[in-house]
């Protein structure tokens, strides 16, 4: 931290869903945020990462970068490992050497898909595919360096930006008279804007001091992908599209996805005093922002 109390924060993966929300929040902060994506900093290059972190004098590194294509990871696990593990290790080692605190975003995919109890941070980890394995390896790499770190697992992320389930459903329910959506996979959608606000609150307030560890964050409430799709269509006014529930085995996939992805958020709420909105409220807000952007 500088002598004037201003923190320096490095945000990687700044062009992704979460990174773009952090850009919006960081612009109004008295602290100094530096936003990078692969064009500015290749986090798979250990030397470049170390040089950049040392030169920037960062107090906090927030890693929003990830290889998130679950199916493609099955065909090229090495590529996913490079970004989800090796690059994370580079950031963690730089944080360790410089004394920075690393915030790293992980996933519900580190768990298996069985059971019907919300996942606590200390529950056994058993990823079902390559994506989950590489994300778990990333968590383990952070812990192995011994750096000060806050790991936040999230699930079903969506926003106004990039490609995600909400935007796909908005398009398909506008284009098609009917649609099949799986009902046998259950979780809690996470609006990237809400996750960004939570991270921003923790970072800006210095609430992470002495509270490093693993946390879970998603919006409140539970639904299936079918439920989510129905609510998206309702909120968007796409009532003409009939949405049918179907089994996940009707959509062949290279990797088995978790049937139950509900995360227990008790720890992050109690530790940092966070008030987390219900997924339906945030979904409607996101759709409202998309509609407003279309009108401009």
Task: Locate each region found by the language model.
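NAD(P)-dependent short-chain dehydrogenase/reductase
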Residues: 140-187, 192-201
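Adenosine-cofactor binding site in Rossmann-like domains, unifying the SAM/SAH pocket
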Residues: 29-49
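N-terminal Rossmann NAD(P)H-binding glycine-rich loop of SDR-like oxidoreductase domains
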Residues: 7-25
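Catalytic helix-loop patch of NAD(P)-dependent Rossmann-fold dehydrogenases
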Residues: 82, 87-90, 97, 110-152, ...
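Amphipathic terminal alpha-helices
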Residues: 279-296
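NAD(P)H-binding glycine-rich loop region in Rossmannoid oxidoreductase-like domains
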Residues: 46-85, 94-96
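SDR active-site strand-loop-helix element
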Residues: 12, 36, 61-65, 102-107, ...
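Mid/C-terminal beta-alpha module of Rossmann-like enzyme folds, strongest
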Residues: 205-254, 294-295
């Amino acid at each position: 931290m500088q002598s004037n109390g201003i923190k320096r924060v490095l945000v990687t993966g700044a062009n992704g869903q979460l990174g773009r929300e952090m850009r919006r929040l960081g612009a109004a902060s008295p602290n100094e945020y530096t936003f990078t994506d692969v064009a500015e900093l290749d986090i798979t290059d250990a030397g470049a990462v170390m040089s950049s972190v040392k030169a920037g004098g960062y107090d906090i590194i927030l890693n929003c970068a990830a290889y998130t294509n679950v199916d493609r990871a099955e065909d090229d696990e090495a590529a996913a490992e490079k970004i989800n593990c090796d690059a994370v290790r580079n950031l963690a080692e730089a944080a360790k050497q410089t004394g920075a605190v690393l915030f790293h975003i992980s996933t519900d995919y580190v768990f298996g898909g069985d059971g019907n109890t919300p996942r606590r941070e200390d529950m056994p980890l058993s990823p079902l595919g390559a994506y989950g394995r590489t994300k778990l390896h990333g968590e383990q790499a952070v812990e192995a360096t011994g750096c000060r770190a806050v790991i936040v697992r999230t699930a079903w992320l969506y926003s106004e930006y990039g490609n995600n389930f909400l935007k796909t459903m908005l398009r398909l329910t506008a284009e098609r008279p009917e649609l099949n959506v799986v009902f046998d996979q259950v979780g809690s959608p996470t609006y990237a804007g809400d996750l960004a606000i939570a991270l921003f609150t923790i970072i800006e307030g210095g609430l992470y001091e002495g509270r490093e560890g693993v946390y879970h964050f998603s919006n409140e409430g539970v639904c299936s992908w079918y439920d989510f799709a129905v609510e998206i269509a309702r909120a968007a006014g796409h009532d003409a599209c009939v949405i049918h529930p179907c089994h996940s085995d009707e959509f062949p996939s290279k990797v088995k996805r978790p049937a139950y992805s509900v995360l227990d958020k008790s720890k992050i709420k109690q530790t940092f005093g966070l008030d987390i909105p219900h997924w339906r409220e945030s979904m409607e807000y996101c759709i409202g922002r998309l509609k407003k952007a279309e009108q401009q």
